[in-house]
A protein has these predicted regions:
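Short beta-strand elements bearing conserved aromatic residues within extracellular beta-rich modules
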Residues: 69-71, 107
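Substrate-binding/active-site clefts of carbohydrate-active enzymes
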Residues: 130, 144-146, 150-275
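The feature marks proteins involved in alpha-glucan
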Residues: 1-58, 88-170
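Short proline/glycine-enriched turn/loop motifs at strand-loop junctions of beta-rich domains
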Residues: 62-69, 78
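Glycine-rich, histidine-containing beta strand-loop boundary motifs that form or position
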Residues: 4, 73, 82, 98, ...
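Surface-exposed loop/edge segments in extracytoplasmic proteins
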Residues: 77-84, 117-120
Length: 275
């Protein structure tokens, strides 16, 4: 264990994260850096793992131009000196395994740019986001969901969407917040004769300005649905009523949240320098 004194003068013991090594292999780093891994979300972000027999969370983020990246949160009083990540120079990926951390923990990345400026950023690959905590990322539990939509999935294989009529019920974020019982809501939609629902702003968006087109999290469903599992329950309930679900989200515009993708590592890493 290591004993660390934070910026508030409080001392806390941690299991040494640097004694456990890292989880990504050299081949994975090579594929990620080359853009050849089409399921990068399974490696980037925060994932519960067992490393060296110890359960914890693996963090990985691409920030090739950053001087330093640290994992910060309430667990270390948002002090970037406590959990700096290991940088792999060949790939530009920062990685850290934090022992004993659990799903549900809110976190961000503190990124030190060349020149010394510091920004605190949301994880680009987080699968859960909490807009109420300044768009903090949340470690999502890797627990398989018990889907009950086998009949709907089988029917979809033979469905001709070009010939079958469609009646789509568009659901606003305000409506989503009011859904407490997905099964009851799905039954109501089915009774009205709709074949599909369309979820506005399915991906996490900039709710500060209520701009549904400013995507703030490309891998995290909007927290208006509750947790990702709450959204899965809604989709599951709709499919059981033979209702399709259309997810409406903007892939082309990320907005300008200070904690977002713009100027992520002190350069135009994710956006064009022309904007």
């Amino acid at each position: 264990t290591v004993c660390i004194e934070d910026i508030k003068g409080q001392k806390k013991e941690y299991m040494d994260p640097y004694a456990c090594g890292t989880a990504l292999t050299a081949e994975q780093h090579k594929k990620l850096a080359a853009g050849d891994d089409w399921e990068a979300y399974r490696l980037f972000g925060a994932h519960e793992r067992t490393v060296g027999g110890i359960r914890g969370v693996c963090f990985a983020v691409w920030a090739p131009n950053a001087q330093r990246v640290s994992v910060v949160g309430d667990f270390n009083h948002w002090d970037g000196r406590i959990f700096p990540m290991e940088k792999h120079e060949d790939s530009g990926i920062f990685e850290l395994f934090i022992p004993e951390m659990k799903a549900g923990t809110a976190y961000k990345y503190e990124i030190k740019f060349k020149g010394g400026n510091i920004a605190v950023k949301t994880d680009p690959y987080c699968r859960q986001c909490d807009a109420g905590q300044g768009f903090a990322s949340v470690v999502y539990a890797d627990i398989p969901f018990a889907w009950e939509d086998g009949a709907w999935q089988k029917a979809e294989e033979n469905r001709d969407i070009e010939k079958e009529p469609a009646a789509i019920y568009e659901i606003s974020p305000e409506t989503c917040r009011q859904i407490k019982e997905p099964e009851q809501f799905a039954a109501q939609i089915a009774k009205l004769g709709y074949t599909h629902i369309e979820l506005q702003a399915a991906a996490q968006y900039d709710s500060r300005r209520r701009n549904l087109r400013e995507t703030a999290g490309y891998f995290a469903p909007a927290d208006i649905f509750g947790t990702p599992d709450d959204l899965k329950r809604l989709v599951n309930a709709m499919h059981k009523e033979n209702i399709g679900v259309i997810a409406d989200w903007n892939a082309a515009f990320m907005g300008n949240l200070p904690s977002g993708l713009t100027w992520f590592d002190g350069t135009n890493l994710y956006e064009s320098s022309a904007f």
